[in-house]
Amino acid sequence: MSKDEYLITDAPLKALTVFAMPMILGSFFQQVYNMADSIIVGQFVGSSALAAVGACAALTNVFICIALGAGVGAGVLVSRYFGARDYSKMKTIVSTSLISFLILSVLLGIFGFCFSHSMMSLLQTPADILDEAVLYLRVYFVGFPFLFMYNILSTMFTSIGESKIPLGLLIFSSILNIFMDLWMVARLGLGVFGAALATLIAQGISAVFSLLIFFSRMRRYKSHFDWFDGKELHSMLRIAVPSVLQQSTVSIGMMIVQAVVNPFGTQALAGYSATMRVENVFSLIFVSIGNAVSPYVSQNFGAKKMERIKKGYHAALVLDLCFAVLAFIVIETLHTQISSLFLGKDGTALAYQVSGDYMRWLGYFFIFMGIKMATDGVLRGLGVMRPFLVANMVNLAIRLAVALIFAPRFGIEFVWLAVPAGWFANFVISYVALRKSWPTDKAASVC
């Protein structure tokens, strides 16, 4: 048995822990990568520049989620064929997805660059930070194909049980990004433009290294394959499109929520942006566990090991509980110090209050997000996409309804009061669907 097949051979808790930990560390470094811009800009340029970078976050998340969702469709099928040891189909999926998504990423990058000003204006970005926000966004879109391809390749690595290579590349690119941020922002005084340019260069180098290493890895699996297969593309899109819709729609929802926050002023936006970065750090821990569950489930489904799927789900819930407790302790103890990392000396009392209140509220309820992500991960791994999409749309609807209806009338606090309610509703719907979708040996035999 190959050492690459530990997801279908080792004890479920051990297999998921070994597989998920590099992904969790990778998520941490991904956020370090993203937060470097905010922290360095906030410390060396000021809170207005921080707000400009933060104002772009919700929009850039939409495009990142398109990349992540696109990778899900390919990743589920790669995992399934890998578990079944059908390396010919696996490599055909890999090639087809890389060609298709490279074209898509270039088109999205051109679209984003051309319409940056229009999109930021639609978000009601405060006038005093609009120009800097648009500048940051345009540089971001120049490098978008690199970001897109890196995320697709990371999904490919994890689909075959390899999560350490993406971690190594992320550590390298994060360190490079921080040093270049310090050089361009603090030393050269390039401000928001320097922060965006540093990120673009680091992403580009990381994407090229990922591509070279992945092609080298694929040579281990000797088999004939087609460079492009329309039928496999269709199969992949059946899973990818719902995932893209789910991930991008949720990010669009967050973008709309930011439009609700923007009228409260630059300092409220700075506080909200600071906590959004912190939310992303902890959220991606739970997202990583859910993403680890998907290839685990898909590989075991391909290998016709149905009982291991249930055990893997329970193991994921244990990991989620441990990290939810850790998040609560860290936020309760250090929320003021964490806020100061982003807001610096220029942050007003309002900015610190918004950041601290939002952060502590999230700390109480991260467990809901954890169990939601684990359940969604099983559904994705099984290819059960419709209830997965419905559950996430309900989550979005609750979050938007409360923010849009209550926040303008009663205060900014209602922006984050809806978050755990949406997570919990999502979990309930996903869990009911999962109970109806547990695979049987008979189902696997016709896979």
Residue spans for each PLM region:
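Short runs within selected transmembrane alpha-helices of multi-pass transporters and secretion channels
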Residues: 71, 140-158, 166-174, 195-208, ...
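Interfacial/gating helices of multi-pass transporter permease domains
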Residues: 18, 41-61, 127-132, 192-193, ...
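Helix-terminus/linker motif at the lipid-water interface of multi-pass membrane proteins
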Residues: 28, 32-50, 120-127, 183-190, ...
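Transmembrane helical elements of multi-pass membrane transporters/channels
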Residues: 18-37, 139, 173, 202-206, ...
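Small-residue-rich hydrophobic transmembrane alpha-helices
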Residues: 50-110, 147-166, 271-335, 369-383, ...
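Short alpha-helical transmembrane segments in multi-pass integral membrane proteins
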Residues: 1-20, 78-143, 187-241, 297-364, ...
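Hydrophobic transmembrane alpha-helices of multi-pass small-molecule transporters
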Residues: 62-65, 177-181, 206-211, 281-284, ...
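N-terminal transmembrane alpha-helices
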Residues: 8-44, 58-73, 77, 102-109, ...
